[in-house]
Swiss-Prot record:
GO CC term (a single one): ribonucleoprotein complex
Family: Belongs to the cucumovirus capsid protein family.
Molecular function terms from GO: RNA binding; structural molecule activity
Localization annotation: Virion
Region (Disordered): 1-30
Biased composition (Low complexity): 1-10
Coarse class of the protein's main subcellular location: virion
Key words of the record: Acetylation, Capsid protein, Ribonucleoprotein, RNA-binding, T=3 icosahedral capsid protein, Viral nucleoprotein, Virion
Compositionally skewed regions (Basic residues) per UniProt: 11-21
UniProt cross-references to InterPro entries, sorted A to Z: Cucumovirus_coat (IPR000247), Cucumovirus_coat_Asu_sf (IPR037137)
Protein name as annotated: Capsid protein
Modified residues (N-acetylmethionine): 1
Organism: Cucumber mosaic virus (strain N)
Length: 218
């Protein structure tokens, strides 16, 4: 064997482990990509049902119907004594109520517990007669009659309870924006007093699209 053949054979011997190393590395990279894709799909699946503190609250839950948008309002209940009630009518901004004949399809309520939340609350939305003063007795009767769904939200060690949303469908009622003043959000504090720094309610009213201004405010 001459010198050139000896040198070539030596190179071939040195290359073999490198080829094996590349093969093992490629296999490892492929496995990592598959695992990453599986984790990504799992995270998307979990996120679909996971409550979020992002506002507006249709994000991460229900999509608006075609041709519809929504208006959000935020309610912060006052202190509610143990076993007592609170009610607040839905008051939309004037820029929305001027289109009072636009249909409303759904109302969504999301309960956002603040860090000090350690209570159990019941939340619902009801059509309330204009003559009602939303007294404790009146609200108590509305919770008891079973005429609308009720969301029960209670303290969880994680700080967030999975079922923090209530969706109220008004499609069959042909309700419009002008009717919203007839609806109220009702809260019952079951186990102890609900303090003012424990809870925030986000209410989304899904309605037909309305014209928006193209001029900046003065």
């Amino acid at each position: 064997m001459d010198k050139s053949e000896s040198t070539s054979a030596g190179r071939n011997r040195r290359r073999r482990p490198r080829r094996g190393s590349r093969s093992a590395s490629s296999s490892s990279d492929a496995n990592f990509r598959v695992l990453s894709q599986q984790l990504s799909r799992l995270n998307k699946t979990l996120a679909a049902g996971r409550p979020t503190i992002n506002h507006p609250t249709f994000v991460g839950s229900e999509r608006c119907k075609p041709g519809y948008t929504f208006t959000s309002i935020t309610l912060k209940p006052p202190k509610i004594d143990r076993g007592s009630y609170y009610g607040k009518r839905l008051l939309l901004p004037d820029s929305v109520t001027e289109y009072d004949k636009k249909l409303v399809s759904r109302i969504q309520i999301r309960v956002n517990p603040l860090p000090k939340f350690d209570s159990t609350v019941w939340v619902t939305v009801r059509k309330v007669p204009a003559s009602s003063d939303l007294s404790v007795a009146a609200i108590s009767a509305m919770f008891a009659d079973g005429a609308s769904p009720v969301l029960v939200h209670q303290y969880a060690a994680s700080g967030v309870q999975a079922n923090n949303k209530l969706l109220y469908d008004l499609s069959a009622m042909r309700a419009d924006i002008g009717d919203m003043r007839k609806y109220a959000v009702l809260v019952y504090s079951k186990d102890d007093a609900l303090e003012t720094d424990e809870l925030v309610l986000h209410v989304d009213v899904e309605h037909q699209r309305i014209p928006t201004s193209g001029v900046l405010p003065v």
